[in-house]
Amino acid sequence: MLPLVALVGRPNVGKSTIFNALTRTRDALVHDQPGVTRDRNYGVCRLDEDNHFLVVDTGGIAGEDEGLAGATTRQARAAAAEADLILFVVDAREGTSALDDEILAWLRKLSRPTLLLINKIDGTDEDSVRSEFARYGFGEMLTVSAAHRQGLDDLLDEVIQRLPEEGSGEELDNDPNRIRIAFVGRPNVGKSTLVNRILGEERMIASDVPGTTRDSIAVDLERDGREYRLIDTAGLRRRSRVDEVVEKFSVVKTMQSIEQCQVAVLMLDATEGVTDQDATVLGAVLDAGRALVIAINKWDGLTEYQREQAETMLSLKLGFVPWAESVRISAKHGSGLRELFRAVHRAHESANKTFTTSEVNKALEVAYETNPPPTIRGHVSKLRYVHPAGANPPTFIVHGTRLKELQESYKRYLENFFRKRFKLIGTPVSFIFREGTNPYEGKKNVLTERQVKAKRRLMKHVKGK
């Protein structure tokens, strides 16, 4: 277990900038707008082979107990309660505030080791700033400018001295056997509620307010002997509706999470059916070529008649991805979770299935004999051989002639044939078609001296007859 350092403070004092500087990443969203961070975000600060510690970025504590602000405060308090060291971050330019006073009073009740970290020191009179914050009674005050990486070395030296060798933090590992699952969907379909239900704790802020989740938060989980990484993402909307700069950053984070996951769980709201926004999210998953499971949330709230109507609508709107399994769930009450994870396993296994060249060529031969390509302008495309070219999604390269003339309907036929033959569930199948070139095209055959003599003897023999 790694030591854990928590960044705590009011909104917009630069906690996320400090987090990015310490972890040397851009994992935390940073913007001048207060309240960008809401959920806890964990990262690792790696100084050298021997000195690692976890850092947790928290949302700004705004002094409110209700709504989103209250939920953000509870997340920050949960992070502070489990930390081995708390960095109480304040703003050098704005000085002390009543909210800082409240936060400090609460931190002192925790009885956790705490350092005062004064950020945004650049462009200020440091002596005056120290004098103002001296009333907080810290024996050591650290000053930094995280945006300019000023003072970070002194901060790290102080942190290392105060941390225990073993801590309470658990690092996200790089276990290749851990299944990475991204929960995606439009805003307010229940992604955070579902992740919290799976984890059995309020790890993510769940609210009826659309756009509550702004960052992509990853949490490791062991369930029934299997290892997972759950990634809660911000809701995606059509580009024409994305206005705020913060939301645009959130969209980028979500797209990155889709690219990096192994299985995407697309969440739909059963009470609203499949909307244009849902189609936008589904398109992003298909573009990334990721394995897909569709989770239809709030199914328990429908009457029998509404369920029949919903089933008809789903089959109509999702008919172009018949290979993706659909699971009916309730994120709020936890029903359908076992079926959801079974579908995730099937999709993951199919997406990472390995193939031999001989078996895929046999499949291509059977597919070709069963249904040859149609004749186009007197010519037929020839499929000569195929070989596997990768996984997630399963990819096959087909070599032949006149493949540019191959119709899309025949390409879909090959996809469906391979999917059925190899029992591929929940994953797209990709085919790459390459036309072979004749290496002797344009070259004149030059005979050797021996071949020339043999040709002359043959010609004499023919003429002699």
UniProtKB/Swiss-Prot annotation:
Gene3D superfamilies per the UniProt record, alphabetical: 3.30.300.20, P-loop containing nucleotide triphosphate hydrolases
Gene Ontology MF term list: GTP binding; ribosome binding
Domain of life: Bacteria
Keywords attached to this entry: GTP-binding, Nucleotide-binding, Repeat, Ribosome biogenesis
Keyword Membrane assigned: no
Residues that coordinate or bind GTP 2: 185-192, 232-236, 297-300
One GO BP: ribosome biogenesis
Domain KH-like, first and last residues per copy: 353-437
Family designation: Belongs to the TRAFAC class TrmE-Era-EngA-EngB-Septin-like GTPase superfamily. EngA (Der) GTPase family.
Annotated function: GTPase that plays an essential role in the late steps of ribosome biogenesis.
Quaternary structure and partners: Associates with the 50S ribosomal subunit.
Protein name: GTPase Der
